[in-house]
Swiss-Prot record:
Coiled coil: none annotated. Channel that opens in response to stretch forces in the membrane lipid bilayer. May participate in the regulation of osmotic pressure changes within the cell. InterPro entries: Mechanosensitive_channel_CS, MS_channel, MSC/AndL, MscL_channel. It is found in: Cell inner membrane. Keywords: Cell inner membrane, Cell membrane, Ion channel, Ion transport, Membrane, Transmembrane, Transmembrane helix, Transport. The gene is mscL. This is Large-conductance mechanosensitive channel.
Length: 137
């Protein structure tokens, strides 16, 4: 089997394709959550605590000197990323809870009794024919 053919078979397996779709959707979901935090949650939160913009929180380790830029730790961006993480983690937690609940309901449903085998059907027909013959005599 050629290398390219093996790679194609590997790449087209169900699990790999599902994983790729999950990664793409996860990246898009991450952008949505980041926008939710940065553009919707943080501005009112900053307004509630005296109009503070968290992105502006920073600690200067060394001032700029000539052509050398300042060394700054932007801990406000870190705070915003922590909010992002908490919201994503909560959303994933809720989604997993819902999926587990649906799976539990499916597991609780009683399974349909198995259909009789061909032998059982034939034996039943033979029994019925014998009963019919006995009733005639």
């Amino acid at each position: 089997m050629s290398f390219i053919k093996e790679f194609r078979e590997f790449a087209m397996r169900g699990n790999v394709v599902d994983l790729a779709v999950g990664v793409i959707i996860g990246a898009a979901f991450g952008k949505i959550v980041s926008s939710l935090v940065a553009d919707i949650i943080m501005p009112p939160l900053g307004l509630l605590i005296s109009g503070i913009d968290f992105k502006q929180f920073a600690f200067t380790l060394r001032e700029a000197q000539g052509d050398i830029p300042a060394v700054v730790m932007h801990y406000g961006v870190f705070i915003q990323n922590v909010f992002d993480f908490v919201i994503v983690a909560f959303a994933i937690f809720v989604a997993i809870k819902l999926i587990n609940r649906l799976n539990r309901k499916k597991a609780e449903e009683p399974a349909a009794p198995p259909a009789p085998s061909k032998e059982e059907v034939l034996l039943g027909e033979i029994r019925d024919l014998l009963k019919e013959q006995n009733n005639r005599s």
